[in-house]
Amino acid sequence: MRHLAWLAAVLLLALVVTLPAQAGTPTDQVRQYTDQVMKILENPELRSTDKRAAVRKVANEVFDVTETARRALGRHWNGRTQAERDEFVTLFADLLERTYISKIDLYGGERLKYTGEVIDGDYALVRARIITNKGSEVPVEARMLKRGDQWLIYDIIIENVSLIMNYRTQFDRIIRTASFQELVRKLKDNREQFMTEKAGRSS
């Protein structure tokens, strides 16, 4: 599940569309990044660090991390100050990067096949299937929200399991059994541990 989740997060930036889409649709918004991301992932001259930096830049443009963080925190969001929200969004964005973008080296040529989309006002659902190297297909959905004239991804669903709901369950458990401050501490500790291990690998 973790492998498919990060894979979908990256590949949704490089959605292979097999059906024509009308101008201005959520699919069109995602398609803008297709050539860009695939060239990054498949460029043998780019180092892993360069690929991660390039994919991170694209991800920042197509993912609404603040919305994802807000929904992941659920009912606990409303009780937080603006400073606490800002800090949490930053920590959550770092967590997503460590969980998904840092693993782009695992990319092995998988593709996404577009299967449809549903638009309801400022919300949209883009459906696709991950095509693995063995030919099997895994259903994936991207939930999107319109911000101005741009459609942004705020949730990814793999085989009916939501990225947001997965994190919400974990975060809610920590807050209920301890506190919001404990959640923040854990996220900071996780980030520090990752940076320490990263420094050790590069030394």
Question: Predicted regions: what is each one?
Answer:
Residues 97-138, 190-203:
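Surface-exposed, charged secondary-structure patches
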Residues 21-23:
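Boundary at the C-terminal end of the N-terminal hydrophobic targeting segment
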Residues 7-18:
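Bacterial N-terminal signal peptides
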